[in-house]
Amino acid sequence: AKKQIESGQWDLIVIDSAAYATKSLLSLIDIVDLLVLPTGFSVDDLRPTVTPVNGLRNKGHSTDKMAVVFAGVSESESEYRAALEYLQPCGVPVIPGAIPFLTSFSQAQDKGLALTESPFPGPRQKADDVVQGVIDRLTTLTQ
């Protein structure tokens, strides 16, 4: 991945990396503009998200280059707020909104479509909003 990033040939490279503060994640944080960490609302999901954030921060990396995205979650506002509260002490930015676990998204993916290509306007808008939040965060960091 490092060669592709350094080549300058690409506007965007998406890397599905291992979780936790592994050696590969530590090397990625040095070369990426934004490290997006997907997670759910439960503590079982949040704990393994906070671990690499804290590990990277403890090694001197700023949380500014990281962002959490909630994906595959319920549409519960109280769970959303509780997850935000859980993440607050580690100081990692959170992309506004969430991508809920919906049948319409599963059906879209079964057809090879992106979440933003769901035929249903409500779910599609939720996915669009989160994607736009990632774009906005990346734009802020790279300008």
Question: Where do the model's predicted regions map?
Answer:
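Switch II (G3) loop of P-loop NTPases
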Residues: 5-25
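Structural beta-sheet core signal
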Residues: 15, 37, 68-70
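Inter-motif core of Ras-like GTPase G domains
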Residues: 22-42
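Short histidine/acidic/glycine/proline-rich micro-motifs that form metal-
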Residues: 41-43, 71-76, 121
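Conserved C-terminal guanine-recognition region of P-loop GTPase G domains, centered on the G4
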Residues: 47-64
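Beta-strand-loop-alpha "switch" segments that mediate conformational coupling across diverse proteins
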Residues: 74-76, 84-116
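NTP-binding/hydrolysis catalytic cores, primarily Walker-type P-loop NTPases
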Residues: 115-143
